[in-house]
């Protein structure tokens, strides 16, 4: 974690502009994720002739690489400083585009081309974990730890914005220049971001002795568990809302997903100071309550408008969960370990989203689509109970007070 700067009285637009000037590098990393997202599955399946399994695996490789590399990204950010980690991550995003370009050149040899695509996806996953973790810590170093919740919130906003822009833009690039055109666009985005990042002033890495990974995990895992449970609600909306609408015989699933995204981003924009004013655990519990109501409305919906209101409330509720719990988790460790803490905490969400799809699919096959939303509401209720217990525990029993041994 960077050493905290002197925290001037930054407010409103000036504060947001300083944060956005850093988190735009995370925007660039997620844009390189969004650009090929709607193209590669069809390219692998239709143009290259591989099965749907291989098409899905090519996409999933990036997520696995992100999951496995994220703890290392946090630790290196603590030791080397976040700017170097961001630049390293953006270079990885550039190399992923180079992998796509080489795969296109090797298209006459399908297995070699597939391996190059897979290598590009793995490098992209590593690059994103470094760029994303580093940009959050860089932003905190620039505006001060008082505003860590706002920095995390803005990172989420640019993530959604980049993914929303990237997918249709990637389709246009592919229609214009094939896989080569898409690869060059990815490389151009990453290269531009690197060139913009290099002149920016660094924030110093903290020179304190880092805690071992087990000690960091021991201090943040309860907050991570609450995040993982709450993330199930997001997972079932994002993955299965289309099947839910089909099972009901309704139209409008795409609009429901748009409502979720608007509610998610809008809530973060409307309540930028909520975490500082009420405290992370209090905000998290309020959010859990709203998310539970939303999921119950979806699961019991008899009319399309009920489902849409439920999706809207779920997006509002889930919006501030990550920054609210993240603020508390990061402060549970010394400053020199806050990068590792943030990365370790984020892994819980990565894992939750990874297992929610398959498990919810099994439940859906056994009990029907609506049941998965009721089950997700139950998991969020468990997150609410866990957070309430954390709030009620005496300071000596909280994870941040736990021994590092």
Swiss-Prot record:
Keywords: Cell inner membrane, Cell membrane, Membrane, Transmembrane, Transmembrane helix, Transport. It is found in: Cell inner membrane. One of its GO terms (molecular function) is transmembrane transporter activity. CDD domains: MFS_YfcJ_like. It is a multi-pass membrane protein. GO terms for cellular component: plasma membrane. The keyword Ribonucleoprotein does not apply. It comes from the Bacteria. The keyword Transmembrane applies. The chain crosses the membrane at residues 19-39, 48-68, 85-105, 106-126, 129-149, 156-176, 178-198, 224-244, 252-272, 283-303, 309-329, 344-364, 366-386. InterPro entries: MFS, MFS_dom, MFS_trans_sf, MFS_Transporters, MFS_YhhS-like. Belongs to the major facilitator superfamily. YhhS family. NCBIfam families: PRK05122.1. This is Uncharacterized MFS-type transporter YhhS.
């Amino acid at each position: 974690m960077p050493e905290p700067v002197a925290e001037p009285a930054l407010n409103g637009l000036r504060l947001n502009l300083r944060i956005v000037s850093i988190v735009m590098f995370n925007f660039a990393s997620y844009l390189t994720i969004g650009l090929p997202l709607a193209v590669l599955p069809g390219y692998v399946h239709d143009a290259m002739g591989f099965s749907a399994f291989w098409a899905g695996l090519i996409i999933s490789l990036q997520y696995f690489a992100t999951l496995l590399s994220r703890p290392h990204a946090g630790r290196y950010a603590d030791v080397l400083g976040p700017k170097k980690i961001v630049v390293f991550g953006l270079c990885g995003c550039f190399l992923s585009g180079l992998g796509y370009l080489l795969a296109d050149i090797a298209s006459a040899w399908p297995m070699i081309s597939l391996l190059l695509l897979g290598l590009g996806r793995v490098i992209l996953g590593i690059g994103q974990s470094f760029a994303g973790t580093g940009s959050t810590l860089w932003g905190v170093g620039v505006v001060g730890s008082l505003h860590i919740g706002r920095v995390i919130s803005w990172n989420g906003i640019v993530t959604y914005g980049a993914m929303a822009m990237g997918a249709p833009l990637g389709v246009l690039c592919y229609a214009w220049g094939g896989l080569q055109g898409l690869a060059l666009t990815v490389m151009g985005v990453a290269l531009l971001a690197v060139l913009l990042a290099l002149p920016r002033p660094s924030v110093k890495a903290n020179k304190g002795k880092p805690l071992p990974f087990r000690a960091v995990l021991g201090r943040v895992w309860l907050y991570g568990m609450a995040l993982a449970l709450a993330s199930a609600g997001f997972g079932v909306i994002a993955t299965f809302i289309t099947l839910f609408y089909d099972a009901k015989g309704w139209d409008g699933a795409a609009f429901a997903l748009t409502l979720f995204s608007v509610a998610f981003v809008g809530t973060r924009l409307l309540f930028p100071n909520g975490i500082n004013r009420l405290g992370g655990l209090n905000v998290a519990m309020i959010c859990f309550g709203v998310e539970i109501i939303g999921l119950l409305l979806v699961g019991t919906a008899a009319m399309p408008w009920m489902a849409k209101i439920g999706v809207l409330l779920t997006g509002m509720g889930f919006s501030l969960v990550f920054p609210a719990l993240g603020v508390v988790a990061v402060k549970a460790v010394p400053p020199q370990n806050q990068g590792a803490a943030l990365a370790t905490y984020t892994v819980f969400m990565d894992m939750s989203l990874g297992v929610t799809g398959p498990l919810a699919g099994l439940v859906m096959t056994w009990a029907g689509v609506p049941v998965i939303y009721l089950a997700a509401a139950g998991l969020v209720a468990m997150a609410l109970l866990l957070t309430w217990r954390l709030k009620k525990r005496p300071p000596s029993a909280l994870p941040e007070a736990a021994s590092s041994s």
